[in-house]
Amino acid sequence: MCVALCTVATALWSCDEDETYADQKEKERKAIAGFLSRNLTLLDAQGDTLLSTGKIKVITEQQFLAQDSVTNLDENEYVLFTNTGVYMQIVRKGPGEPIRSGESKRVICRYYEYNILGDSLQTSNQTPYWATNPEVLDVSNNSGSLTASFNTTLNGGGAMYMIYKNISVPNGW
């Protein structure tokens, strides 16, 4: 009987404390809107600026494609990829041709991953420790669908792989 009462009490207490999925999505939307509209500056332990976002101007994928798949840095543009919810600023397009169907290429990148709900830098490979180990991605085009995995054979893996221990590249990368 005592176990049954504890179970019921726990279930009732849990229901009062749990956020619904709709509540979580609303909280996420508000956090994203707040992040996009403020001027954020991330500092390292010595007080040096790591990243300053400025006020972000969001553009659509259609605008992004019309601009030759780059974002305007002077206007602090970020493209929103609606299928993943990822906002990305393309600093440089890079040399070479786009990956054709059936082809694979190696891509090297650096990144900041910011946790807007925790208001903190989550991970980054733009620190002296990771300077010699950028993210190395093996990207393939399978009939127009791009897939990628972190290459760990060249440098043992970059920060993203070492932190999350997964060779799968997050959606939107």
Q: Could you say what each language-model-derived stretch is?
A:
Residues M1-V8:
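Sec-dependent N-terminal signal peptides
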Residues T10-S14:
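C-terminal motif of bacterial Sec signal peptides marking the signal peptidase cleavage site
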Residues C15-W173:
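Cross-family detector of peptidyl-prolyl cis-trans isomerase
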